[in-house]
Amino acid sequence: MTSDKRFAFTKIFVDDIEAQASFYRAAFEMREKNRLTIGTGRDAVEEIILTSGRGDDSSLIVWRYPERPTPAQGEAVVGFNVPNLEDTVRAVEAAGGTVHTKIEQMPELGFAVAFVKDPEGHLIEIVQNL
């Protein structure tokens, strides 16, 4: 039995929304799907919705509170499945991110994985199916 329910998005809080959106575009070839400003004053949020461009893909939403402090980093782990893990890790570093855990081959599980951090310290899990 299949379900029409699916994972839709992950939101991460950021300080510099433009720089963070640029990082995810450069490192993971994401595209901007939409940009929103919602609410006013302390209730205001700004968000940029990013996607890989596939019609069935989930979205990554980077958002910030213009009138409030940004919550502590590390509040979410973002996961990406990629065709070439080494190339993607290099793209992360070139875009200003850092390697948190080097590539680990897990052939018994059918994948390789690395953990990286974006320029503001958000943890990202990158998986390549073997």
Residue spans for each PLM region:
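N-terminal beta-strand motif that seeds the catalytic metal site of vicinal oxygen chelate
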Residues: 1-21, 75-78, 130
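Core segments of cupin and vicinal oxygen chelate
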Residues: 11-57
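Conserved positions in beta-strands of structured domains
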Residues: 31-33, 63, 100, 104
